[in-house]
Regions:
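N-terminal intrinsically disordered/low-complexity leader segments
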Residues: 1-9
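Helix-turn-helix
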Residues: 13, 17, 21-56
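Alpha-helical structural segments
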Residues: 13-20, 24-25, 56-72, 84-88, ...
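DNA major-groove recognition helix of helix-turn-helix
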Residues: 50-51, 61-62, 137
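Hydrophobic alpha-helical connector segments
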Residues: 70-111, 130-133, 137
Length: 187
């Protein structure tokens, strides 16, 4: 592809290319040079869109994966809504499992705050007290991120011939989610 026909570099395109690298090769293989090669630009061109460099890139990856709010206004039973949303969030986390370590190590609270607040609002509208709804939302987010990390690790070990092949991850996920939701329903 010649430079005349190259798609312009944008922040979104940079994040998408970085996700492609992390998803395919792992977080450790993400470098600004490799990212520049993927975008067909010099690595320094990326800094025009991400002035803080790799720090801003990593924050952008976290935001892209972690931000997945639940609409508080949608209808239906709150447990069913949370089950459906949680299943989608799990898929999102597993699709980009290379970013999971960043979700717990980066100082990017805004990325998870909006999503957690949307879950909290659903719980509050379901009749839970404010503090219980806040605790429940954080517990549910912790469960989702923790389960996705364990599942990604287990699947990787299984693919490498290690233990974990006999685990029914879907059953384990829904079983754990049911425990969390049952606890919230009793609150």
């Amino acid at each position: 592809m010649t430079s005349q026909h190259r798609e312009p570099v944008t922040r979104d395109r940079i994040i998408d290319a970085a996700l492609h690298i992390v998803d395919g090769q792992g977080l450790g293989r993400l470098t600004m040079r490799r990212l520049g090669d993927a975008l067909e630009v010099e690595a320094m061109a990326i800094y025009h869109h991400l002035p803080r460099g790799k720090e801003e890139l990593l924050d952008g990856l976290v935001a892209h994966v972690a931000v997945h709010p639940l609409s508080p206004a949608a209808g239906g039973e709150w447990q069913d809504r949370l089950r459906g949303w949680a299943a989608g969030y799990r898929e999102r986390l597993l699709e980009h499992s290379g970013v999971l370590p960043l979700l717990v190590t980066r100082r990017n609270p805004a990325a998870l705050d909006g999503t957690t607040a949307s879950v909290q609002e659903v719980l509050r509208r379901a009749g839970l007290r404010e503090e219980t709804a806040a605790t429940g939302a954080h517990t549910l987010m912790g469960y989702l991120i923790g389960h996705a990390a364990l599942e990604a690790r287990g699947r990787a070990l299984s693919e490498a011939g290690g233990p974990g092949g006999a685990i029914d991850w879907d059953l384990r996920f829904t079983g754990g989610l049911d425990v969390v939701l049952a606890g919230l329903a009793q609150s």
